[in-house]
Every structure is written in C-alpha cells, then in structure tokens.
Regions:
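A charged, aromatic-enriched C-terminal amphipathic alpha-helix characteristic of glycosyltransferases
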Residues: 375-410
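Short alpha-helical donor nucleotide-sugar binding micro-motif in glycosyltransferases
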Residues: 82, 295, 303-308
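Conserved donor-binding/catalytic core segment of Leloir-type glycosyltransferases
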Residues: 211-230, 236-241, 251-254
Length: 410
C-alpha cells in the first residue's frame, strides 16, 4: 500500500515496496497531464476509493481470504474499478500473487503489461535449498502444524506458480530486466513481447556514498533472513571459517529477530526454519556474532549499508535483487550467490564477487578476501554502472516509451 494511502487510512506504512512508490511519483512528474490510478488489495470486506494528491486509489477487499489464493469475487471488483476509471493501459506489478490474474480474467480485452519482479513458479524449485528433508522434519514446531511448515511453504510457491503461469500465458506484453527473467518468460509464453526496463530505487540510496574510513570493520549486512530462499543458513555455515581468520566479525541482519524467545508469543510463533537456525547458532556458538536490527525504514536501511564493511546477498535464487542494487549504488563492497539474474548485476569484478550458492567455503573465502582488500576498494566503476542502471530519468523515459509502444500495438 502506497504511503499516502496508508496515512489516509491510518494504517502503518509498509517498509517494503518503496521503489514502486518512487516509480509512481516519477511517472506523474514526467507526465503532468496523466490520469493515474493505483489499485491494491486488503483483508477487509469493503471497496475503498480515494483520491489523494491527484492520484486515484482503489483498495479491493479480500473478504478475509488469503492473498495467495485465487479469489473469483475479485473479478467483479476489477470490473467496477475498470468501469469507474476506464484506463487506457493497465500495468500489473509482479506475478507472485493472483489478484493480477483476476483482473486479466475479468477483462480479457483490456490493454495490459505485466512487470516481472520474481517468478514464484521458478523460485519454488529452490525454496528449501541448503536444507535437507531430515532437517525439515526434525524442526517442525507447533506454529508449523497450525500455519504450515517448510514443505508446505514450498507447496504454496508451487500453487502460486500455477496462477503466475496462467497470467503470463494470457498477456501479450511483459517488462523485465535480466537475462534470467527473459529466458523463463519466453519459455512460458514464446510469442510474448518482452520489454526491457531497469528499476528505479528508493531516493535515499542516490544521496550517499560508502567509505571504508567510516564503516565498521569486519561487518556484514544482510537485508532478509525470514525464509530459506534468502540463504541466511548458508552465511551461518560459512561463519566458522570466517571467524577463524577474523574473530571480530559481526553480521547485521535486517528485520525481526526470527530466533527470539523473550516472550511466550515469540516461542509460540517460532517456525521450523527459525528453530533450525537457532539450533545451528547454538551448536556452533555463533550467537555473539549475529545482530538482528529489527525492521528498518528507508533511512535506517541506508545507514546500515553505509556502516557495514560488506553487503552479502546469499539467496538460493533472485531475479535482480533491489538490495544488491542499493548496495552497489552506495558503493558498498558486494558479494552475491551466482543465481538467477545476479550475473547481470555483477558483470565485472569491480561490481562484486559471485560464488556458487552451495559452496559455503567459497563464500567464506570471498568475504575474507574483501575484508583484506576493502581498505583499498575502489567503488568508482561499480557506482557508475549502478547509477546508469538505476537512473530514474532514463528508466522513466524508457517506461513511457514502452507504454506508448503498447498502446500503438493494440
């Protein structure tokens, strides 16, 4: 939900998705006569329509149903929204949730383009990478029994992937940004028209520059650790090798402390994955090296990038990580697993180090190498390449061209 809408409804603004708000603002600024509407979903039962700062907002109700399951009743709401706003073009951001599919099924003749963020149908293959079946069974918790364990988490990705593929076979135009998403989209729907356009990131990350002199030496920063796909366990597996050489190493992890047991509520809500992580940390006596920062807004996220010695993206799969893009834009030394579209974001050694996801020893070596060399790290080329990739004006001009080309095509 966009910040102006959240504030108007008295709802806490979401930390994620800030890049989308930046993109919407840029779209309005570059097209002063544009009529823009933004639609989203929420758990309640009433359709909300609001106009704020020249933008019309529609909030479609899920009536208490999960956003991961297909809700046929959304089709009628989409028809209401379409009739009220009468859009020339509809841009669906992301394929991960089925409310976009509901729009396309309700209005099959509408002019639509879909942006690829991640591809859940592909990510499902790698959901539990690095974790054995035995480890999953050994760490099932009460919360898993009620809400679903790691196996069911993967199953949910698979089910959502069915909706995703359905959506991609129904549309004629898609926007992507990596060789990875291009290959997979074309495999799903060969005739689809693929339009390349890079992402514009959040404003704060264009305004600062990392420096070795002001960073906290021998620290790592991870922006996510909540579920297996993000690769936190791989960092923990690499950590014993790292602290043998750099015993003062610290890992800052953005987000809630998934292993906290301070309250009964923490214990009750602990997932099997969190239990596995906690056991691993205890077994290898790693707790002193790990600091969960709590949820971070844009400014505080930026501060942690700047204070850290290295940014690591250890995911088992990514399309193009916005976190990696933010780190590169700031000039933080970067390491990423060689998965998905990571190679497109790290085309040269100046932009970072790539390693194979499974090779935790290689990850450890990459970290130790950067610890040693970061005093003389020259981030000029990385920042230049990243600034070109995430150039807000250039990306907005490209998006405008895509919109115009699609409208002419229909």
């Amino acid at each position: 939900m966009m910040p102006p809408l959240s504030e108007s409804l008295g709802i806490k603004t979401s930390i994620g998705g800030g890049w989308m708000y930046s993109s919407a603002k840029k779209l309005k600024e570059s097209n002063t006569s544009l009529e823009l509407a933004i639609a989203t979903i929420y758990p309640e039962s009433q359709l909300i329509v609001k106009e704020i700062e020249g933008v019309k907002y529609y909030v479609l109700p899920l009536n208490g149903k999960k956003n991961t399951k297909y809700n046929k009743h959304l089709e009628n709401y989409w028809k209401i929204v379409h009739e009220d706003f009468k859009p020339d073009l509809v841009h669906i951001h992301g394929t991960e949730y089925p409310h976009g599919l509901a729009y396309v099924k309700a209005l099959p003749n509408s002019k639509v383009v879909v942006s690829i963020q991640g591809l859940v149908s592909i990510c499902a293959r790698y959901y539990n990478n690095g974790i054995t079946f035995k480890e999953i069974l050994q760490n099932i918790t009460l919360y898993d029994v009620i809400k679903g364990n790691l196996l069911q988490g993967k199953k949910s990705f698979v089910k959502r992937g069915v909706y995703e593929r359905d959506l991609l076979t129904r549309v004629e135009h898609v926007i992507g940004r990596t060789s990875w998403d291009y290959a997979h989209v074309k495999a799903i729907n060969p005739p689809i028209n693929y339009h390349f356009c890079n992402e514009t990131l959040r404003k704060e990350f264009y305004q600062h520059q990392w420096s070795y002199d002001t960073c906290e030496k021998h620290t790592l920063f991870l922006t996510q650790a909540g579920y297996p796909l993000k690769g936190f366990l791989q960092i923990l597996k690499a950590l014993p090798f790292i602290i043998n050489r750099y015993p003062d190493t610290k890992i800052y992890v953005a987000g809630a402390n998934i292993i906290s047991d301070k309250t009964w509520k923490d214990k009750l809500k602990r997932t099997g994955y969190a239990k596995l992580i906690k056991r691993f940390i205890k077994k290898y006596k790693l707790s002193q090296y790990i600091i969960f920062t709590g949820p971070l807004d844009e400014k505080n996220m930026c501060l942690y990038y700047l204070k850290s010695n290295i940014f690591v993206c250890p995911s088992s799969i990514e399309n193009s990580s916005n976190s990696l893009g933010e780190a590169q834009l700031l000039g933080v030394p970067c390491i990423a697993s060689f998965v998905g579209g990571a190679a497109d974001m790290i085309p040269t050694e100046a932009c970072g180090i790539l390693y194979r996801f499974e090779e935790v020893e290689m990850l450890a070596e990459a970290i130790c190498t950067l610890f040693e060399k970061s005093q003389n790290f020259d981030n000029t080329e990385m920042r230049k390449i990243s600034a070109l990739r995430h150039d807000a004006d250039k990306n907005q001009a490209r998006l405008n061209d895509i919109y115009n080309n699609i409208l002419q095509d229909f």
